[in-house]
Amino acid sequence: MLSRAIFRNPVINRTLLRARPGAYHATRLTKNTFIQSRKYSDAHDEETFEEFTARYEKEFDEAYDLFEVQRVLNNCFSYDLVPAPAVIEKALRAARRVNDLPTAIRVFEALKYKVENEDQYKAYLDELKDVRQELGVPLKEELFPSSS
Protein backbone atom coordinates (compact mmCIF):
# COMPACT_ATOMS: atom_id res chain seq x y z
CA MET A 1 0.00 0.00 0.00
CA LEU A 2 2.76 2.43 0.85
CA SER A 3 4.56 1.82 -2.44
CA ARG A 4 1.42 2.76 -4.38
CA ALA A 5 1.15 6.05 -2.50
CA ILE A 6 4.82 6.85 -3.10
CA PHE A 7 4.64 6.41 -6.83
CA ARG A 8 1.23 8.07 -7.31
CA ASN A 9 2.08 11.34 -5.63
CA PRO A 10 5.14 13.06 -7.19
CA VAL A 11 5.73 15.30 -4.15
CA ILE A 12 6.00 12.34 -1.79
CA ASN A 13 8.07 10.50 -4.35
CA ARG A 14 10.71 13.24 -4.48
CA THR A 15 10.92 13.71 -0.71
CA LEU A 16 11.03 10.04 0.22
CA LEU A 17 13.53 8.98 -2.42
CA ARG A 18 15.90 11.91 -1.87
CA ALA A 19 19.28 10.95 -0.38
CA ARG A 20 19.82 12.26 3.11
CA PRO A 21 23.17 13.16 4.64
CA GLY A 22 24.79 10.50 6.85
CA ALA A 23 24.99 12.78 9.91
CA TYR A 24 21.22 13.08 9.97
CA HIS A 25 20.85 9.29 10.06
CA ALA A 26 23.38 8.93 12.88
CA THR A 27 21.60 11.56 14.98
CA ARG A 28 18.26 10.00 14.29
CA LEU A 29 19.47 6.51 15.23
CA THR A 30 21.00 7.81 18.44
CA LYS A 31 17.77 9.47 19.50
CA ASN A 32 15.71 6.36 18.75
CA THR A 33 18.20 4.12 20.49
CA PHE A 34 17.92 6.05 23.74
CA ILE A 35 14.16 6.24 23.53
CA GLN A 36 13.77 2.52 22.95
CA SER A 37 16.19 1.32 25.62
CA ARG A 38 14.71 -0.27 28.71
CA LYS A 39 16.08 -1.39 32.03
CA TYR A 40 14.83 -4.92 32.43
CA SER A 41 16.88 -5.70 35.53
CA ASP A 42 15.32 -2.80 37.40
CA ALA A 43 12.07 -4.69 38.06
CA HIS A 44 13.76 -7.52 39.96
CA ASP A 45 14.65 -7.46 43.62
CA GLU A 46 18.17 -8.30 44.62
CA GLU A 47 18.60 -11.82 45.90
CA THR A 48 20.03 -12.20 49.39
CA PHE A 49 22.84 -14.64 50.11
CA GLU A 50 20.44 -16.88 52.04
CA GLU A 51 18.00 -16.97 49.11
CA PHE A 52 20.89 -17.70 46.75
CA THR A 53 22.05 -20.56 48.97
CA ALA A 54 18.56 -22.05 49.31
CA ARG A 55 17.93 -21.79 45.56
CA TYR A 56 21.13 -23.56 44.57
CA GLU A 57 20.78 -26.23 47.25
CA LYS A 58 17.37 -27.00 45.76
CA GLU A 59 18.69 -26.94 42.18
CA PHE A 60 21.51 -29.36 43.02
CA ASP A 61 19.03 -31.67 44.75
CA GLU A 62 16.84 -31.64 41.62
CA ALA A 63 19.68 -32.12 39.09
CA TYR A 64 19.01 -35.47 37.43
CA ASP A 65 21.90 -35.89 34.99
CA LEU A 66 25.43 -34.69 34.34
CA PHE A 67 24.35 -31.89 32.02
CA GLU A 68 22.05 -30.44 34.69
CA VAL A 69 24.72 -30.69 37.39
CA GLN A 70 27.25 -28.89 35.20
CA ARG A 71 24.70 -26.28 34.13
CA VAL A 72 23.80 -25.50 37.75
CA LEU A 73 27.49 -25.40 38.70
CA ASN A 74 28.20 -22.97 35.88
CA ASN A 75 25.33 -20.72 36.94
CA CYS A 76 26.27 -20.94 40.61
CA PHE A 77 29.89 -19.92 40.07
CA SER A 78 29.02 -17.17 37.59
CA TYR A 79 27.82 -14.87 40.38
CA ASP A 80 30.12 -12.39 42.06
CA LEU A 81 30.17 -14.28 45.36
CA VAL A 82 31.54 -17.48 46.78
CA PRO A 83 28.88 -20.15 47.37
CA ALA A 84 28.28 -21.30 50.93
CA PRO A 85 29.76 -24.62 52.08
CA ALA A 86 26.24 -26.10 52.08
CA VAL A 87 25.94 -25.35 48.34
CA ILE A 88 29.36 -26.88 47.67
CA GLU A 89 28.31 -29.98 49.61
CA LYS A 90 25.12 -30.30 47.54
CA ALA A 91 27.17 -29.85 44.36
CA LEU A 92 29.56 -32.63 45.40
CA ARG A 93 26.69 -34.95 46.28
CA ALA A 94 24.98 -34.19 42.95
CA ALA A 95 28.19 -34.89 41.02
CA ARG A 96 28.66 -38.21 42.79
CA ARG A 97 24.96 -39.06 42.37
CA VAL A 98 25.35 -38.84 38.59
CA ASN A 99 28.61 -40.81 39.00
CA ASP A 100 31.00 -38.14 37.71
CA LEU A 101 34.17 -37.84 39.77
CA PRO A 102 35.88 -35.27 37.47
CA THR A 103 33.05 -32.80 38.02
CA ALA A 104 33.36 -33.26 41.78
CA ILE A 105 37.09 -32.54 41.56
CA ARG A 106 36.41 -29.47 39.39
CA VAL A 107 34.09 -28.09 42.06
CA PHE A 108 37.14 -27.61 44.26
CA GLU A 109 39.12 -26.14 41.37
CA ALA A 110 36.37 -23.59 40.77
CA LEU A 111 36.25 -22.86 44.49
CA LYS A 112 40.01 -22.30 44.56
CA TYR A 113 39.75 -19.65 41.84
CA LYS A 114 36.64 -18.07 43.31
CA VAL A 115 37.90 -17.36 46.85
CA GLU A 116 39.93 -14.24 47.57
CA ASN A 117 42.93 -15.89 49.23
CA GLU A 118 44.48 -19.21 50.20
CA ASP A 119 43.19 -19.01 53.79
CA GLN A 120 39.57 -18.95 52.62
CA TYR A 121 40.23 -21.97 50.40
CA LYS A 122 41.74 -23.86 53.35
CA ALA A 123 38.73 -22.92 55.49
CA TYR A 124 36.40 -24.40 52.86
CA LEU A 125 38.55 -27.54 52.69
CA ASP A 126 38.40 -27.91 56.48
CA GLU A 127 34.62 -27.40 56.46
CA LEU A 128 34.10 -29.96 53.68
CA LYS A 129 36.71 -32.49 54.81
CA ASP A 130 34.18 -35.05 56.08
CA VAL A 131 32.07 -34.80 52.93
CA ARG A 132 35.15 -35.24 50.73
CA GLN A 133 36.17 -38.35 52.65
CA GLU A 134 32.63 -39.76 52.60
CA LEU A 135 32.26 -39.30 48.85
CA GLY A 136 35.87 -40.16 47.99
CA VAL A 137 36.63 -36.90 46.21
CA PRO A 138 40.36 -36.15 45.98
CA LEU A 139 41.77 -32.71 45.29
CA LYS A 140 43.77 -31.90 42.19
CA GLU A 141 46.69 -31.03 44.48
CA GLU A 142 46.59 -34.59 45.84
CA LEU A 143 46.40 -36.18 42.39
CA PHE A 144 49.04 -34.00 40.70
CA PRO A 145 51.30 -32.48 43.38
CA SER A 146 53.87 -31.12 40.90
CA SER A 147 51.39 -29.16 38.73
CA SER A 148 49.79 -27.13 41.54
Swiss-Prot record:
Please give the chief subcellular localization of this protein: mitochondrion
Q: Where is the transit peptide?
A: 1-40
InterPro entries membership? Cyt_c_oxidase_su5A/6, Cyt_c_oxidase_su5A/6_sf
Q: What terms describe the molecular function in GO for this protein?
A: metal ion binding; oxidoreductase activity
**What are the TM regions of this chain, as residue ranges?**
none
Pathway assigned to this chain's UniProt record: Energy metabolism; oxidative phosphorylation
- What miscellaneous comment appears in this entry? Present with 12500 molecules/cell in log phase SD medium.
Q: How does it assemble?
A: Component of the cytochrome c oxidase (complex IV, CIV), a multisubunit enzyme composed of 12 subunits. The complex is composed of a catalytic core of 3 subunits COX1, COX2 and COX3, encoded in the mitochondrial DNA, and 9 supernumerary subunits COX4, COX5A (or COX5B), COX6, COX7, COX8, COX9, COX12, COX13 and COX26, which are encoded in the nuclear genome.
**What does the UniProt record say this protein does?**
Component of the cytochrome c oxidase, the last enzyme in the mitochondrial electron transport chain which drives oxidative phosphorylation. The respiratory chain contains 3 multisubunit complexes succinate dehydrogenase (complex II, CII), ubiquinol-cytochrome c oxidoreductase (cytochrome b-c1 complex, complex III, CIII) and cytochrome c oxidase (complex IV, CIV), that cooperate to transfer electrons derived from NADH and succinate to molecular oxygen, creating an electrochemical gradient over the inner membrane that drives transmembrane transport and the ATP synthase.
Q: Write the protein's name.
A: Cytochrome c oxidase subunit 6, mitochondrial
Name the gene that codes for it.
COX6
